[in-house]
Regions:
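Conserved ABC ATPase "signature" region
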Residues: 118-134
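Conserved ABC ATPase signature
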Residues: 137-141, 145
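Conserved catalytic motifs of ABC-family nucleotide-binding domains
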Residues: 158
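Catalytic Walker B motif of ABC-type/P-loop ATPase nucleotide-binding domains
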Residues: 162-166
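H-loop/switch region of ABC-family ATPase nucleotide-binding domains
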Residues: 198-199
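H-loop (His-switch) and adjacent beta-strand-loop-beta switch element
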Residues: 211-223
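ABC ATPase nucleotide-binding domains
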Residues: 229, 236-273
Length: 273
């Protein structure tokens, strides 16, 4: 992996900067070496309450490793990580293996390892539009349904920071749009910070306040439109990739149903082609 110097891009949207809250977690100059291989070099990142930060980059770029450093699951070999003293974290990993032979329903899944009241279970399932799944076996859920249930589990502990590793990997395009709208709604309701990890460029950039492009180091960072036009981004993903940011950047005055179809009438003011 080539570790060329990062090209700084620290542009902050004024509206975003005015609404974010206290710093929840930060990394300063962190590096990580595993088995003699450099995974991360001199990375700076911070996540504040009320903002959505996305780590993007190719497979093997160190995105998940950086998230694990921020969560304290591994220790950096250089630099330091600082977490708020009262930080509560909700984490949805990239893979959450569940043995299909074990008869466990959604209600039981949400209580594994934690004590949760039935009203709390109902509340988080309602929040992610999955209350109707409460008594359904985990083994029969679709990919999108299971992602919502995993998100509900992460919300049970009232986290101040929500970390989602490739949350849309099992979803089609319509499902991705629904999920990222839901994530945005959670941020607005709860005021929590959200760290997203993805290598998918089509929707996740438009759902983010700030983006860091990672390839062992921070190639570039800033608001989505600035990152998408950055030469380091184009070098990693191709010059056509920047057009993906515009796909879902506008604010909707319509809703989608569970199939992804638009629920508003013809006068909603948007093109849905």
């Amino acid at each position: 992996m080539s570790l060329s110097p990062a090209i700084p891009l620290r542009v902050r949207d004024a509206d975003i900067a005015s609404t974010i809250g206290a710093e929840l977690v930060s990394a300063e100059g962190v590096g990580l070496t595993l088995g003699g291989r450099q995974i991360l070099v001199n990375v700076d990142v911070a996540v504040h309450a009320g903002e959505i930060v996305t780590l993007i980059g190719p497979n093997g770029a160190g995105k998940t490793s950086l998230a694990r450093l921020l969560l304290g699951l591994v220790k950096p070999t250089a630099g330091k990580v600082t977490r708020a003293s009262d930080l509560r974290v909700g984490y949805v990993p990239q893979r959450f293996p569940v043995d299909a032979t074990i008869p466990i329903d959604v209600r039981r899944f949400l209580t594994l390892g934690v004590r949760v009241s039935l009203p709390a279970i109902r509340s988080v399932l309602q929040e992610v539009s999955a209350l109707h799944l409460m008594d359904r076996p985990i083994a029969v859920l679709s990919g999108g349904e299971f992602q919502r249930v995993c998100l509900a589990r992460a919300l049970v502990g009232m986290p101040k920071l929500l970390v989602l590793d490739e949350p849309a990997q099992a979803l089609d395009y319509a499902g991705e749009m629904q999920l990222y709208e839901l994530i945005g709604d959670i941020r607005k309701r709860r005021g929590c910070g959200i760290l997203l990890i993805s290598h998918d460029l089509h929707v996740v950039l438009g759902a983010s306040d700030r983006v860091l492009c990672i390839n062992g180091h921070v190639c570039c960072e800033g608001i989505p439109e600035k990152v998408a036009s950055h030469p380091e981004y184009a070098r990693l993903f191709g010059r056509e990739a920047g057009k993906a940011v515009a796909v879902y950047r506008h604010r909707h005055d319509h809703e989608h149903d569970l199939s992804g179809a638009v629920k508003c009438g013809d006068d909603c003011g948007h093109s849905h082609d």
